């Protein structure tokens, strides 16, 4: 009788675990898919949907009013893991942050905006008081001068293009399309590495990003070549 009950208990635990993972997968599939091809292009409005996302790093913040320029530069320039501004991550790669081991995920968003909160939820990560890292690679067939990086994020964020700080969105903010734009830059012929960090205390986390020309029109003649 004891062995029978023990067997039933183990079976119940196994079913619960399987259901939990299935639910997490379904949640992820609601917002993301695994890249099906080696390259992709921006959507019809120019938004870049393919990203390498790192599971969120714990960064204690009970409020977002602390997100001043100086606070953010300290937070974003702190080294949480080796090569965070130089390494091009691959899907499934692991990084060590303190006592935690976090994974990189190559994902294609089903929406124009990247739902970081849902990503964290699906990977069973902490949801509040966190910092997300995102990386994508843009390939150009020729130099594209005088473009602007246009970003909306919830909450604050910082963005680098080819290793240069290009845009900072400070303060407690909601995600709004083209909420902030960079100075004019040139996307060079070949590969351009885009890195971003998004920080949030309480509330949802997401971002949207595209490049626009001097008329404010989206740049679409580029390829996204993140490793799968």
Language model regions located:
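Beta-strand-rich ligand-recognition modules
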Residues: 161-209
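Bacterial N-terminal signal peptides
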Residues: 12-20
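Aromatic-lined ligand-binding clefts that engage carbohydrates, nucleic acids, or primary amines
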Residues: 145-160, 194
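Accessory carbohydrate-binding/adhesion or oligomerization-edge regions at the termini
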Residues: 26-114, 197-228
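Short beta-strands within extracellular/lumenal beta-sheet-rich domains
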Residues: 128-139
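Non-cytosolic beta-sheet module surface loops
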Residues: 140, 149-153, 198-200
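N-terminal secretory signal peptides that target proteins for export/translocation
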Residues: 1-6
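Short structured motifs
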Residues: 118-122, 133-135, 178-182
